[in-house]
Swiss-Prot record:
<feature type="active site" description="Proton donor">
    <location>
        <position position="73"/>
    </location>
</feature>
<dbReference type="InterPro" id="IPR018089">
    <property type="entry name" value="OMPdecase_AS"/>
</dbReference>
<keyword id="KW-0665">Pyrimidine biosynthesis</keyword>
<feature type="binding site">
    <location>
        <position position="191"/>
    </location>
    <ligand>
        <name>substrate</name>
    </ligand>
</feature>
<dbReference type="GO" id="GO:0004590">
    <property type="term" value="F:orotidine-5'-phosphate decarboxylase activity"/>
</dbReference>
<dbReference type="InterPro" id="IPR011060">
    <property type="entry name" value="RibuloseP-bd_barrel"/>
</dbReference>
<keyword id="KW-0456">Lyase</keyword>
<protein>
    <recommendedName>
        <fullName>Orotidine 5'-phosphate decarboxylase</fullName>
        <ecNumber>4.1.1.23</ecNumber>
    </recommendedName>
</protein>
<comment type="similarity">
    <text>Belongs to the OMP decarboxylase family. Type 1 subfamily.</text>
</comment>
<dbReference type="InterPro" id="IPR047596">
    <property type="entry name" value="OMPdecase_bac"/>
</dbReference>
<keyword id="KW-0210">Decarboxylase</keyword>
<feature type="binding site">
    <location>
        <position position="222"/>
    </location>
    <ligand>
        <name>substrate</name>
    </ligand>
</feature>
<dbReference type="GO" id="GO:0005829">
    <property type="term" value="C:cytosol"/>
</dbReference>
<dbReference type="InterPro" id="IPR001754">
    <property type="entry name" value="OMPdeCOase_dom"/>
</dbReference>
<feature type="binding site">
    <location>
        <position position="44"/>
    </location>
    <ligand>
        <name>substrate</name>
    </ligand>
</feature>
<feature type="binding site">
    <location>
        <begin position="71"/>
        <end position="80"/>
    </location>
    <ligand>
        <name>substrate</name>
    </ligand>
</feature>
<dbReference type="Pfam" id="PF00215">
    <property type="entry name" value="OMPdecase"/>
</dbReference>
Length: 246
């Protein structure tokens, strides 16, 4: 098994898959999750679902045995982000993220806020959104390639005390070389078939490609949530992960 995965999972739950629960309400979410096995995946709640349902749904999913990635991408003054991370830790959240562009003081405050917890959430920096291309960066005044900006922000996140970053699979290999084997790389934009890309994720890869590139966790939304048999998809991705690790 990939040592990066086993470092952050119990022996009963060593899977790289994070399922993005891209639903808009509690009923649909619980109806989908009811058929999932917490040993096959972690789960992620983003802004839409959390805004619609609040912490009650998040805590319910944690109580069902799921490791929860609270994907709210904090970006605020250091005190506010630190307090938000403490609340997430109190809830039992497994992973929480923030924009690395919020700067060193913000990230250091977040790391300090959760340092005293026996089981603290993984703190993950968001580097460059996977929907963004070089032209998008240029429009906001960053005349650099996405890959260069990702590495710059990832180094800042690591030196500020974060556990890892969100990055596309294309950036995983250079980040692994730059930041070492213990830094967590969370990769969205994962598709079972790269030709099947109807949404706003630009820099995509298959599970096997992403794992080979050095990704630790694979975020999958519609390829799982809209599958005819989501459990079969999860089992297949985990099979690929086991092959890749051995």
């Amino acid at each position: 098994m990939n040592p990066l995965i086993s470092d952050f999972q119990t022996p009963q739950q060593r899977t790289p898959v994070i399922v993005a629960l891209d639903f808009s309400n509690e009923k649909d979410t619980l109806g989908f999750v009811r058929n999932l096995d917490p040993t096959l995946c972690q789960i992620k709640i983003g802004k839409e679902l959390f805004t619609a349902t609040g912490r009650n749904l998040a805590e319910s999913l944690i109580n069902q045995g799921f490791k929860l990635f609270l994907d709210l991408k904090y970006h605020d003054i250091p005190h506010t982000v630190a307090q938000a991370c403490k609340v997430a830790a109190d809830m039992g959240v497994w992973m929480v993220d923030m924009h690395a562009s919020g700067g060193r003081r913000m990230m250091e405050a977040a790391a300090e806020a959760v340092a005293g917890y026996g089981t603290k959430p993984l703190l993950i920096g968001v580097t460059v959104l996977t929907s963004m291309e070089q032209s998008d960066l240029a429009e906001i005044g960053l005349n650099t390639a996405p890959e260069e900006q990702v590495i710059r922000l990832a180094k800042l996140a690591q030196s500020s005390g974060l556990d890892g970053v969100v990055c596309s699979a294309q950036e995983a290999a250079p980040l692994r070389r730059e930041l070492g084997q213990d830094f967590v790389l969370v990769t969205p934009g994962i598709r079972l078939d790269v030709a099947d890309n109807n949404d706003d994720q630009r820099r995509i890869m298959t599970p096997a490609e992403a794992l080979a590139a050095g990704s630790t966790y694979l975020v999958m939304g519609r390829p799982v949530t809209q599958a005819a048999d989501p459990v079969a998809v999860l089992r297949e991705v985990n099979r690929v992960a086991n092959l890749e690790a051995n």
